[in-house]
């Protein structure tokens, strides 16, 4: 018998009982095997063998916070090599071990010990900064070959891995199965086997009909892990690695899931490697082999039966009642080791010494002997390689055998990804509705604005405007591809690791689905716009227009997908996308004809597909059109037509008809022969970019990750930090804030003088849905007294979190009945402030340090009677008390970055303590996901807090006996929310054990008392075989507790007078704004990628607009180009407006999920503080934009008073910056997600800018929309801006802009035009003394040209004040809307709390 077989745990063993899967599951697995046999897909197995295997990473081990300025200097550091050097650090050092097919391995070690890195390396997931050394082979097949050609056989499932969120279980499993079922000839169609396999797997995991129509996004965590296992079962990997996926589950659920995985491993012969936090003895003995890692060093590898004896022989002894896992993981914490004093030999202390002892041990020698034997059986590597290829020949398409790790041909990959994309959109109703609404709404807006255009020369501008807006809108809407691709990048990475498909196949498949969707909405858009605006009414013209909008959509969709693939971060993608949209609009030919673009940028116009599309639809509309003149000049009523001309661009003398083609030649220099040529050019662009994207997709790295390194803030001393902008000047160390330098005792500081008793009686909680009514809590009663630590136990969905939220008075949707008192006082004032509550996964500002986070909460939540220095001194005592001193200046970070999970849990406790809530503290599963030793240390800290005077109620889901012994009392709930135990537990948990022995009628129980208790809890869900709640209710202990609860409530020790009349918030409104503004500013300052993207956009956009209109002349068309230069400022503002919304929604999520319920600050202060920081940042960056735009555009050349006009233009830009900042905040306030905010922002921008005076001239706006002309803020901004920069700017007509006409006999040109000039009020005759060939220019200065757009220079200060009013209105509306939406029932329903 092999060593691994000896190490296997017996399922009937007391330490592993009740780990057997349901019979239904084993039956379904047998059915699954029958199908695989029928398909000839069984018999493939593989183990692995590692020898001196090392994973090295290159990084800077002391990674300081890089602020915005530091990031700006980063390129210089790279060039001159002045930045921090990267060290090569071994993450996994010299790992030895092997695992036979069908066996299982448990990887132990504290967080950061290298376990996750080992599992990823085993599955071929190696990051850019990592490299593998040593030997690793899979039954003789070298890891380099396996990782490149057989990656699909290696499955890694990490915590929080990506899924297709808007798809049903059935469709997901069919997708995975279709990607892993070879394209061979079978007895039945391939689709038949796919459906059959998926039905079996869904039945096996109880994911039947109820889940078929539910998308994965609404699943709870328990169902999600079932889906993960089912997905892995469909993929049929040879080696499975599970990286702590079950960290949020209770032990019962973990055992259930692992038992299913074990059965699959045994039946299919797959090899299992797993990391399980807080593994009980039952879980531990489910594995065959175990390895223990200590800071990257392997200090044990062998059968599970040898783990504990090995370390006992080394001279260590376990703590009382500790599990095997607790014992061995405690050895990786030097302060937790218990040394056997009778041991005579050497006792290791450092990781290197543990490693040396392991290398000299007999267990290591046995391991090497078994490894040698294993390698001998697979010594002929090449022969096994050939055999391996022979075994997989059926499972690979022959042409791809030696190069492609995917099992199906490319065309089937495209089909599978297209199918899953289709169903993904089919179930994403909100996206489809928003997608269609956006196109239809914009079409109705544009079509109605240009409704029924007349065939007159006065509407030549309008006809061109509707065409330009139509083509630009369809192009700009494809920018959503950037967001779509970025959402899919993590999915691409995961599926690429699993070798389900090539990323290029997914890109092609999604294009095949999304492009027809766009064709549908573009068709609707084109029909509405084309026929409402009365463009050329014939079939040929319509279908040409339709064709070019379609090809432009296709081309620009490919362009923005290419941009998203090239971008490494969302900020870079937004930057490139924003610049791309700006360039697309400027150089499309509509804003400025190509001939006016400087040679330095003209190549961009030729590389812009929209330019060719605009040219073609303009030719399609104007070529062959004869347009009657709206106004003949100068004397149509008194002089013959030969002495008049048409006052329109391209108007001719002696005729009242304007040729549409002549108009295009004069204004744009378009040629009719280019119409179909342009179509070919656009398609060429599209095909080239699409092909480039498909090639690029297979070679770029998705979702790059780096080694987890905490970031810290460099602090030389407290006094230096106090002088910086990060911390207030009052901030000083305790020795400086207290003149007498008196040391405050920690225990006294943390305890309180009150003896508050939290008491609750007959609590019931019910959640009502559309289809059912569920009782979560049923008649729960109890109390918390001082110096007591109480455990709250129960399965998932038993109501633990609900009870804690009700007791803490945190918001929860549902019906609550019962009484809650504080020392007998019902409904005391501000009860929420007197109870500390640590939620399950609290959210903090990731850019803040630990110390800064605690100081913020102390300053905002402690009483105003304490000075800021006292509050900060108290924070230092909390840091010392909880042992956070070493990480006090580390960045908190996000998921997977920043602080370790253990320190984040300590931080959540420290935050509540720093607020000094009172003597009551409630915690919702604070130890979840921690390793056994970290969980024990955290509960020890809770015990220490309880002994210092706090009353603590803490829910736990994966306790061990050693952890349970730290509690004083235990409250157990069943799945119906009934109390089944609430009492002390006795010495060594004897009272608790005896109670459950008595009601079960047994005298035996597991050696692990916690296992026995959890085993009893497991029976609570197996039906009404026994009334556990009734049994407890009949006990004397329960009756005594109820009597005590009644006594407390009937004899209150407090009155309302005992509580001071406090306001809802502890601090003043302005202090809240100040502290939150400083917090937000620090977060922005340290989120350097965001600020870099913004500053780069403002500089680049300003320079692009400025130099696009550089050295424009003084002709009519060139002056109009300068007006469009100012118009482009409004277009550029949309990128900044969209850029602030993700940050607002991020801050809002923290506020709504955590800070709001703790009454830290008001929502008004939240919005104003966010606005102040955004206003400062945006105004600073807008100033950079202004200089890049104003001076290259040459506006200063026309102003005789440069300081005033330039200063006024800057002032208008600043108030406009504040306007769109508040507009973006207001839209984000009412938006549930970033995507929705982006869509609403785009729709609002287009709606407002349609009435800015430059899209449709005010004089020809249809009657229905005339009211919007007076309401558009962009109209007032552009009027003020353009009036300021172009006031008194002279106009000298170019030759083609001058109208030539002969006056009647005996009339000079001046005499002939005098009446017309007086009546029209604009224009100039260049040769008034001449009697022939009069030269008339329509405008003599820019002010006359601006009048046609409805702009007047004299309105400049009025416009400035109106913009101030709009800004104030937006800010007030944002505050009001946030309050209204938060208070409405549907908002509470949308934020409904899902019980645990």
Curated annotation (Swiss-Prot):
One of its GO terms (cellular component) is plasma membrane. InterPro entries: AAA+_ATPase, ABC2_TM, ABC_transporter-like_ATP-bd, ABCG_PDR_1, ABCG_PDR_2, P-loop_NTPase, PDR_CDR_ABC. Pfam families: ABC2_membrane (PF01061), ABC_tran (PF00005), PDR_CDR (PF06422). The chain crosses the membrane at residues 431-451, 466-486, 512-532, 543-563, 572-592, 680-700, 1095-1115, 1166-1186, 1208-1228, 1245-1265, 1361-1381. ATP binds at residues 794-801. It is found in: Endoplasmic reticulum membrane. Residues 73-320, 758-1001 form the ABC transporter domain. Its main location: endoplasmic reticulum. Belongs to the ABC transporter superfamily. ABCG family. PDR (TC 3.A.1.205) subfamily. This is ATP-binding cassette transporter pdr1. It comes from Schizosaccharomyces pombe (strain 972 / ATCC 24843) (Fission yeast).
